[in-house]
């Protein structure tokens, strides 16, 4: 089942943005990590989405066993921005999110949700991270224009049924990304990056793929990796002290150097096309014992009644004292 699901994700990947999208796909984490949250607390989406952007989250302060509640994740960004797609063209940003719940908490089924909750989640397909980690929820990619906020329906566990769960305060870890990443799952760079000079020297030539790889001289064509074999890919040649050096720049990033320009190693030779980024927040969530709530309500009621009786007793004493003075 998992293989079928990953295949579906790959199909969406291909249809959505080209051959190597590095998009807002939290599912990429499933391919490389057993747990999307590292020991340091960092959610691994940040390893591919290198730019930091805000994430917002609304989490209830407290819930009771069996309660179906919602966690709302906000993914704000400038809707006028467009990102560079895998083929170098411009398009809208996709968004995705991951919610790391305490163990025992899980995604609510449609039957468990209220009508309002079903409507809030009707256009989102949320899945557990894996069969072993049903407490970690993923969603995305989704069109960012329609999904500035994503709602996760969650069921709270019952410590009476699950001894591993206790009535206590927990932490919820939430990550939200928008736009394509800078690192592909295999570790290669996507075209949503700044490309830099490989060595100190002078730019001597720029060869461009107009239609296919045959547009380049054979010695340059051999340098182009398969994922960059696209119209618009450029091969920059630099004259350096160590001989001729080359840099392959995929379509999308715009060159900021011209033939004849001198560069230092590490200097940017393109602009930074990235307009997206990843954000992470943490929230407290209390699993409340309903029996304690009942006793608390009873205690508060007793305190209120006691205070009322004291007030009445005081009034009674005042009336007696007034009568004695008049008598």
From Swiss-Prot:
A molecular-function term among this protein's GO annotations: electron transfer activity
Keyword terms of this UniProt record: Electron transport, Heme, Iron, Membrane, Metal-binding, Photosynthesis, Signal, Thylakoid, Transmembrane, Transmembrane helix, Transport
Family: Belongs to the cytochrome f family.
Name under which the protein is recorded: Cytochrome f
Highest taxon, organism lineage: Bacteria
Residue stretches spanning the membrane: 293-313
Cofactor note: Binds 1 heme group covalently.
Binding site residues for heme: 25, 45, 48-49
Any single GO BP term: photosynthesis
Segment forming the signal sequence: 1-24
Main function: Component of the cytochrome b6-f complex, which mediates electron transfer between photosystem II (PSII) and photosystem I (PSI), cyclic electron flow around PSI, and state transitions.
One Pfam assignment: Apocytochr_F_N
GO cellular component entries: plasma membrane-derived thylakoid membrane
Subunit-structure text: The 4 large subunits of the cytochrome b6-f complex are cytochrome b6, subunit IV (17 kDa polypeptide, PetD), cytochrome f and the Rieske protein, while the 4 small subunits are PetG, PetL, PetM and PetN. The complex functions as a dimer.
């Amino acid at each position: 089942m998992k293989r079928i699901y990953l295949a579906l994700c790959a199909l969406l990947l291909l249809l959505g943005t080209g051959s190597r999208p590095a998009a807002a796909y939290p599912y990429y984490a499933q391919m490389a990590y057993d747990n999307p949250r590292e020991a340091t607390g960092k959610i691994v989406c940040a390893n591919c989405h290198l730019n930091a952007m805000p994430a917002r989250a609304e989490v209830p302060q407290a819930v009771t066993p069996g309660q179906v509640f919602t966690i709302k994740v906000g993914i704000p960004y400038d809707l006028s921005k467009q990102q560079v797609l895998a083929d170098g063209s411009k398009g809208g940003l996709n968004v995705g999110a991951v919610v790391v719940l305490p163990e025992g908490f899980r995604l609510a089924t449609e039957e468990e949700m209220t009508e309002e909750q079903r409507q809030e989640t009707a256009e989102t397909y949320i899945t557990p991270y894996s069969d072993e980690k049903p407490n970690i929820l993923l969603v995305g990619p989704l069109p960012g224009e329609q999904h500035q906020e994503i709602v996760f329906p969650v069921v709270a566990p019952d410590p009476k049924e699950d001894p591993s769960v206790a009535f206590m305060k927990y932490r919820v870890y939430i990550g939200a990304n928008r736009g394509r990443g800078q690192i592909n799952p295999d570790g290669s760079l996507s075209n949503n990056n700044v490309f830099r000079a490989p060595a100190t020297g002078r730019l001597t030539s720029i060869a461009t793929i107009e239609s296919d790889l045959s547009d380049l001289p054979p010695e340059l064509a051999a340098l182009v990796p398969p994922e960059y074999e696209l119209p618009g890919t450029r091969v920059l040649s630099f004259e350096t002290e160590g001989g001729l050096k080359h840099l392959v720049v995929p379509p999308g990033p715009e060159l900021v150097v011209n033939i004849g320009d001198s560069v230092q190693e590490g200097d940017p030779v393109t602009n930074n096309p990235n307009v997206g980024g990843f954000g992470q927040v943490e929230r407290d969530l209390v699993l409340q014992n309903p029996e304690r709530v009942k006793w608390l309500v009873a205690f508060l009621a007793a305190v209120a009644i006691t205070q009322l009786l004291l007030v009445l007793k005081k009034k009674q004493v005042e009336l007696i004292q007034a009568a004695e003075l008049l008598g």
